[in-house]
């Protein structure tokens, strides 16, 4: 009995202890689970925070990327606009450089220097030029710098300066004999938006310049008309679709401009009208007290010099060879009285008498005459009376013809024949003597070009030439200081040889 009770008590005690121990373990596990759950929650919170930060960073990256792309697009757009503006500016404004030059060497058949030049004959003193091919030994250069711009309102501006120099020496250093000078410096204003009616599209100008509508006969190195000086005017006043006019006032000086007592200036007022191919120009000239002008020694220069004058030109500018065939041609009839009797270089001769009268005709043309040939004939003739002294007379006529034979695209043979007749009666002026007679010149010139071989007006050219010239013996007596009759050239004929370059652009 005792043993059974004891055993029961022992079992009860053991069972209670185990139960208490189990309850203790469950509480610990539960606490641990709660702590673990808390840590998991905290980890989840931290992960969520990190995820939120990552999403925020990604959004910022996307925003930055978008902004960068926008900036790139803006930069590209600005660059495109800038390029367009720069291109537009380049199209509207810019500098230009143009020029003319010739230079060459010439010798006679003895290997010595010889006389040459388009104005070497006695008639050359009054403008009687002869063919220039194979007849020039000088170096002459013109350099033109221009700046042009077009404003947003459509108005245009143009500034031009021209520097030129001429030399007859073959040396490379020629400062002591230089004729370097500024021949042009002027400004033009065109298409002014406030100009209306006939003045719409016209061009104002002022400064020192060659007149825009001068023209010449290149093969004899002679201007048909050369109006130049310092002044101002207006071009292209349009009265209707076919009639336009130019108006200008030029000033020139006579005599030594460094002489403080010389105040004589020649003013030239010009009206120049164009109707289709026709040109009509009228000019009035005035040089107050020209007959009282004195030299640097105080001596009267010319007591019968003219103080006024008139000049007129009637021209025809064809885009065909005298209306007969393809090509071009220009013809002009000129008249001058008093100061206007120097009909080529208007207003350039202050020694003309008030009764001086001059008539001149000039004409030239160019045309192809076969597959490989082109021809350019020219005529220049003048009659001038009472020019420098009462009763004097200067009459002459030049006939010139140049031919080009194309050999290939870079080589041609050029031929030129020039004939001049003159009947000069200076009546003792400047110790000149009355003469009459003829001058002849023939030239053969193998010529190299880069292209447009048959075009009379394309350059540059390099020529090798030989020329034969002769004159009437009577012309030797005209003067002691001109080319003809001097030790360098006499009647009887002379051969000359040389080479020359010529260019313009």
How does the language model describe each region?
Residues 434-486:
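C-terminal structured domain segments
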Residues 94-96, 138-142, 156-160, 182-184, ...:
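Extracellular structured ligand-interaction cores
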Residues 237, 242-246, 262-263, 269-448, ...:
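Detector for outer-membrane/organellar transmembrane beta-barrel domains
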Residues 152-153, 194-199, 241-242, 323-324, ...:
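Short, solvent-exposed loop/turn segments that connect beta-strands within catalytic domains
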Residues 23-26, 30-196, 204, 237-240, ...:
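Beta-barrel outer-membrane channel/assembly domains of diderm bacteria
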Residues 110-133, 171-186, 194-302, 482-487:
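Surface-exposed coil loops of outer-membrane beta-barrel proteins
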